[in-house]
Regions:
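Structural boundary/hinge residues at secondary-structure and domain interfaces
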Residues: 1-65, 72-95, 216-317
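Leucine-rich, highly hydrophobic segment in Treponema pallidum outer-membrane-associated proteins
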Residues: 120, 128-129, 136-138, 145, ...
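Short C-terminal domain-edge/linker segments immediately following a structured domain
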Residues: 30-37, 101-104, 164-168, 246-247, ...
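Short secondary-structure boundary/capping segments
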Residues: 17-20, 149-152, 192, 220, ...
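C-terminal/domain-terminus segments
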Residues: 271-272, 327, 457-461
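Residue-level signal for secondary-structure boundary sites
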Residues: 10, 78-80, 142, 185, ...
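Generic detector of solvent-exposed, compositionally biased contiguous segments
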Residues: 27-38, 104-115, 188-192, 284-301, ...
Length: 493
């Protein structure tokens, strides 16, 4: 179920007026309906679209015939009734056979034909019930909606799951979406793998920085956060450069695999891609490439000993498709053993573990000596740096590039915490929370879309929104029994 809780004209605050007009015109292109003349005079502040049943006739032998219902709030019943009659009269002139039926006191008008799975997608039924204009792809869907209205214990509002989820909806929401996850999986012919979460409610709200999308997942299982909630951004972010394209920060990676976020990730990726491992490789290609380049397994070789604060950043690399990276870890009793383990992996992978001095700072490096041949005559030796790390104050800083470490040590570039786009986002994301994931869309759009294919899909789905996008900031918060809530702030121009 998707509900738009404002008049569509108000959405011009998000999309440019020209772009919004194009969207409205494309939706009505085949109906000979003019939005401004025929719909705008009566349309009020709610439009709801729902998948009400997976199979209208409940006969699996003739395939799934999904039932769709649209409800539009009206502020002028006379005008909306005129619109309904106009719409169906145009369908009659186009050659459709119409039928009018009284059902429980409600006038239902619909295309009269034998409904096959292919015909249902082009069929239409309509009615006016109280202050709503109803449309569906089959009269049975309209009748079921009337039954639900007259028998409140049958409708969605009476569902305990919906009541629990709807309590999390912000009061200023522009739109709300509710998903019954097992039913959604059946509809899309997906197998709901590792089904920890059974329901989801998503809301959209405008604020001074852009658009906040909050999502709440419901489960009957115990919620296990990866760490104690953080009341402020981790101090490790002070060593992450302002020009960062992607930054991930939080605390205690050692418990990440058993956390609520990990279960949600596994459920989503396994359902969509068939396995959580395949989903990870498709969605976070940059991290997978870094892992392969260093012969590491993040969960086994790093996460186990990171029990304090951490911050990971990806930066664009003009010389290589693999982005540069920075990883900052708070000092803990487990740190020394963790570094020794990484040194052993580097040595066993054929890298040299050496020490050097940079800006008066002792630095350890993992290097590889390779040969270069010039003009088939002289052979030169070249040292290739795979990674460097050093201790600074209460943190260990790892990076892929010696020049990046030099900039961090010399403080030539402001930290991410002083980046206005990131800093302003922090005031919108609720606290306490589990940390942040930050994407700078303006500086890293090409890299991110190439390395994270799902972001390319976002642009295809909503180009006007993406064209005005500056950055995205994700976080998880409001952990309550059986509830996981998180949000993403889309900072807009």
């Amino acid at each position: 179920m998707v509900s738009l809780l404002v008049n569509p004209d108000a959405l011009q605050k998000i999309a440019q007026k020209r772009e919004f007009s194009q969207i409205k015109n494309s939706l009505l292109a085949k109906s000979n309906i003019d939005y401004q003349d025929d719909i705008q005079p009566w349309l009020n502040n709610e439009i709801t679209l729902a998948v009400t049943t997976l199979d209208i006739d409940r006969d699996p032998d003739n395939g799934l015939q999904t039932g769709y219902l649209m409800a539009l709030a009206t502020k002028n019943p006379v005008k909306s009734r005129e619109f309904l009659e106009l719409l169906f009269s145009k369908r009659a002139f186009a050659g459709n056979n119409l039928e009018i039926e009284r059902y429980k006191g409600v006038k239902v008008i619909y295309d009269h034909q034998e409904y096959s799975a292919s015909q249902i997608s082009n069929s239409l039924a309509g009615a006016i019930v109280n202050n709503f204009v109803l449309f569906a792809n089959h009269p049975q869907v309209i009748k079921a909606a009337i039954n639900n209205l007259q028998a409140p214990d049958l409708n969605l509002v009476s569902s305990l799951e919906y009541q629990k989820a709807s309590q999390q909806i912000p009061k200023n929401s522009l739109a709300v979406t509710f998903f019954n996850l097992p039913e959604i999986s059946k509809w899309q012919k997906l197998e709901l793998a590792e089904s920890t979460y059974h329901s989801q409610i998503l809301s959209l709200a405008l604020n001074s920085q852009g658009l906040l999308a909050e999502s709440t997942f419901l489960t009957n299982s115990q919620i296990v956060p990866p760490s104690l909630p953080l009341s402020q951004p981790v101090a490790a972010l002070q060593y992450i450069p302002e020009s960062t394209t992607l930054a991930i920060s939080g605390a205690n990676l050692s418990n990440l695999g058993n956390s609520d976020l990990a279960k949600l990730w596994k459920q989503g990726t396994a359902t969509i891609y068939g396995s959580s491992e395949d989903g990870i490789s498709r969605l976070i290609q940059p991290l997978i490439k870094i892992q392969q380049n260093l012969n590491l397994n993040f969960s086994q070789d790093i996460f186990t000993w990171v029990t304090g604060e951490y911050a990971l950043a990806l930066l664009t690399n003009s010389e290589n498709a693999i982005p540069n990276w920075v990883f900052v870890v708070e000092k803990t009793p487990q740190l020394a053993a963790g570094i020794a383990h990484l040194d052993n992996i580097a040595s066993s992978s054929g890298f040299n573990v050496i020490s050097l001095t940079l800006n008066g700072q002792k630095v350890s490096a993992w290097t590889q000596i390779i040969t270069t041949n010039q003009n088939n005559q002289s052979i030169n030796l070249e040292t290739k740096v795979k990674g460097v790390h050093t201790t600074l104050n209460n943190y260990e800083i790892f990076t892929s590039d010696l020049n990046i470490l030099k900039e961090i040590l010399s403080q030539k570039q402001r930290p991410l915490l002083e980046n206005p786009k990131f800093k302003n986002s922090l005031g919108i994301i609720p606290q306490p929370n589990q940390g942040y994931i930050y994407l700078d869309w303006e500086t890293g759009q090409n890299l991110l879309q190439h390395q994270i294919p799902v972001l390319k899909l976002m642009e295809l789905l909503d180009k006007p929104l993406i064209d005005n996008l500056q950055s995205l900031t994700f976080s998880s918060y409001h952990n309550q029994p059986g509830i996981l809530t998180g949000g993403v702030l889309l900072k807009l121009n």
